[in-house]
Amino acid sequence: MDIVKNEICKLLTKRTVLILLFLLVLNPVLGLYTMNTVNDDGYTGKDYSALYGEISNYSREDVLPEIEQRQMTAEAYGRISLCSRVYKEALACLSYDEYLDSVNEKADEISIMNKFSGNGGFAEKNAAKTSRVYSKLNGTVPEVIDASGLLNITDNELTDYVAVIMLFIIALNLVFYEKSENQLALLRTTARGRRQLMASKSFVMIMAVILITLLLYGINAVISMCFYNPINLKSPLQSVYLYYGSPFKLSIGQFLACYFPVKIISFILLGLFFMLICAALDNIIFVFVASAVTVVIEAICYTTISGTSFLAFLKYINIMYGVRTGRLFSDYVNINLFGYPLNTGVLYGLFWLVCIAVCIFAVTNYLNSVHEKKLLLLPGFACGKNTGCHTSLFLHECYKALVPGKVLLILIAAALFVVWWNPAEKLSYDSVDEVYYKEYMDKYYGPLTAKTNELLDEERVKYDRLSDNIAYDMEQGKSESYINIKYKDELSRQEAFNKLTAHVDYLKTLNEGWLFFEKGYDILTDRTDFKNRDTAQAFVYVILLIAIACGICGADYANHEIRLLRTTRRGRKQHMGIKCILGFLGTVTAFALVYIVRLCNVLSAYGTHGLNAPAASMEHLWRISQNISVGQYILIIMLMRFIGGLLVSLFVFAMFKYLRSGMSVIISCVLFIVLPLALVAFGVTNAQYMLLNPLLIGNIF
């Protein structure tokens, strides 16, 4: 028990407490900001809750006509979209019996089809099992209620990932700090070695998880009670639209009683996993990169893999599936396990039980054994290892960064990742219309002139004749199928031409508009449609920059070599100058790997014909000056990202100078560089303008 008390005291240092309090305060502040900020659909979270409060007094028979009436009389776009959303949710609640009937009907259809085909496989078993599960919900009557308060607690992505960052910081303080200071070496000669100590650290992590969960989600619950309509804990869980397809016959109160134990268990697994990474890796750079890559890969698997994919097990055997706990209750999904439908909730339960046991055993026993670093030399190499000695400070710093600083390994891993992440881009079309649209753009490529307008008018006359011919055939009694087959190519071209003329109408508002096929440039410059790619690139860029900068500076502070330079004639001036040069070269390398490779890949597939055209010719860049070309705009974006990378490297250098600890520097980078980017990924309004985000993302105009 004394060891446990000591470990708790270690967590209560001024630095750790201040960081955790900062994150604890940041969570409700961002939650309140998001609640009062207009979203992309034109309304706020308070507007959504207020509309539910207004319709709560209407009976089940009158609520839909009332919402429909409000939608018809609404004038603002935001109000219309808000009413449309609430109408959809209310309709789903009031027609829940029809939803249950559709589940049974689908099961019957699959059963009949499999009887005729003679194949009683997974599909039939899955349909029958799903029907049996949902038959238990007969008699459930969902209510039209405001679910904002509940979702603020159970479906708050921002809170979930703030908790992940807090667990990472606690794992660093519990395990890596003592390990990096060689304090654990003192315990090798004791009777039980480090086993009892590591068991105590695991117990403290479990206690910290429980406390963090109660604080973070308890604060969210207080916000829900103060700013949203009251939650009726006796209402069926299916009253909440997110949990409309839930197979569990639970009230909202019972759901909350099940939700938090599952949430805590998932966080315990993640916290122990972070502790295992800290125990297994000796370098803070590797700890940071391994933890960041693990969370990113888990999040990518959870969000991008389809539930029907053969890789679906990676979606559901996933720590993030448990961290985003509400999804365990919102859907009923079975995966194919040798022809037997196994529920993903059961699968995840088995997964976390096994993983928690493995992590506790590994964390407790790994550091108990002796791990000595051995220098391996090839035969005959030792005699010649001193040949070619030099006194170049620059080459010495290069060696320290590449080998002790692990930058060489990081660059090799980054290069392999870039090769996998950026396969050869090919010219692709979303539809047949787009093929014809490109043909038109290539045909009329160039400035929009009077001659171009004449050619467009001639083409428009052709489609006017086409409309006359179709009208004539319809008068002759020709069927619609006959007309679609006869004029298939012409109709496809007409859709492309209509899209072209709409774009021409926009170009006429400019002093000098250009016609060119802009899809490749949309990929590089459109922050709306390709926002996720920009954010993902910024994450990779930042992780690589932090790892390289820590490798350049970290070796000197890890072995306290920096103290030896105080008594030299020039102090650290020349030394830091060389490190700045290496930081610049590292930034150039990271920038080339993340952005230049992608740029060359896209331009090689879609061509460079539009680089000289005004950037404003693309409709999403209507704010950009017409004097700036597409090529210049892309250059501006790239320059912003490069400057952002330099600032990240300078930030890491400055943190090393003032904090003198690799662990403290990593925590600072997570708080001030990684976390703001995470807010962009979470969809927090205007987060792209925080700190270094405008420079790192680039596409903010």
Task: Give the predicted meaning of each segment.
Residues 8-23, 284-286, 398-413, 662-663:
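Membrane-interface helix starts
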Residues 22-24, 285-298, 411-417, 663-676:
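Central hydrophobic cores of alpha-helical transmembrane segments
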Residues 171-186, 190, 194, 549-564, ...:
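Transmembrane helix boundary and interhelical loop/hinge segments in multi-pass membrane proteins
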